[in-house]
From Swiss-Prot:
This is HAUS augmin-like complex subunit 2. Residues 85-105, 162-182 form a coiled coil. Component of the HAUS augmin-like complex. The complex interacts with the gamma-tubulin ring complex and this interaction is required for spindle assembly. Interacts with EML3 (phosphorylated at 'Thr-882'). The lineage of its organism: Eukaryota, Metazoa, Chordata, Craniata, Vertebrata. GO terms for biological process: cell division; centrosome cycle; spindle assembly. Belongs to the HAUS2 family. It comes from the Eukaryota. Its main location: cytoplasm. The keyword Coiled coil applies. GO terms for cellular component: centrosome; cytoplasm; HAUS complex; mitotic spindle microtubule; spindle microtubule. Contributes to mitotic spindle assembly, maintenance of centrosome integrity and completion of cytokinesis as part of the HAUS augmin-like complex. It comes from Mus musculus (Mouse). Keywords: Cell cycle, Cell division, Coiled coil, Cytoplasm, Cytoskeleton, Microtubule, Mitosis. The keyword Coiled coil applies.
């Protein structure tokens, strides 16, 4: 095999080339891996792709804005439709006519309002009599509960304070309940102790009488342990 000409740049190999040949010969890397690494796109291609993505996102945002405008136009199309505008104009015209009639009869209406309405029967059709009765029942119920409603409205700003007071009262009630339970247990124990003492006294008197008859000094009276602990506690 002829030696490579060191003066020929085409036949000379660099250190990187020699290293890659050594890696391929040793099996650490393959030619396919080297080919894939050669085909990687340069960084400028990624910049161009990023610019394309930004342009596409801007276009999507613009399309979304146009879509929202179309939806808004569709929703408001019924309001500005000629038929709806005609109805509104008719309502305004009828209101205007009513106001003109009120202004024409202003003096008569004022005199009627100044005149008292006591002891006068208002004309009411028979069809609406039952509704009037029901309305009167509702009015009576409302008047009866009116003061309660007023108190509720007045106390509504102080609702938090009332809740705190209620919580404190409940806590105190729990403490009192616990103390009452302890007191009840102590009373039951005291009753049991009194029962034991009442049963023991006749027996003690009998023994004392018997010892007295035999001229023997009686021992000190025996009290149960529970009675001694209760006396010390007192």
């Amino acid at each position: 095999m002829a030696a490579a000409n060191p003066w020929d740049p085409a036949s000379s190999q660099t250190a990187a080339g020699l290293l890659l040949n050594h890696l391929v010969a040793s099996g650490i890397v393959t030619k396919e891996m080297l080919d894939v690494s050669k085909k990687m796109a340069p960084c400028f291609v990624n910049f161009s792709r990023l610019q394309q993505i930004s342009d596409i996102q801007a276009e999507i945002y613009q399309n979304n804005l146009e879509l929202e405008l179309l939806k808004l136009e569709k929703d408001t199309a019924d309001l500005i439709h000629p038929s709806h505008l005609i109805e509104k104009c008719d309502v305004l015209q009828s209101m205007n006519n009513h106001l003109e009639a009120v202004l024409k009869e202003k003096h008569a209406i004022r005199q009627r309002l100044l005149r008292p309405m006591c002891q006068e029967n208002l004309p009411l059709e028979a069809v609406y009599h039952r509704y009037v009765v029901h309305m009167l029942d509702l009015a009576v119920t409302f008047i009866e509960k009116f003061e309660t409603h007023l108190e509720t409205v007045k106390n509504s700003p102080h609702l938090d304070a009332n809740l705190k007071q209620m919580s404190k009262a409940l806590a105190k009630m729990d403490i009192l309940v616990n103390k009452t339970e302890e007191l009840a247990e102590n009373i039951l124990k005291w009753r049991e102790l009194q029962t034991e003492i009442s049963l023991y006294i006749p027996k003690m008197l009998t023994e004392e009488r018997h010892l007295h008859e035999l001229d023997i000094v009686p021992p000190l009276p025996f009290f149960p342990k529970a009675h001694t602990e209760t006396s010390r506690a007192k």
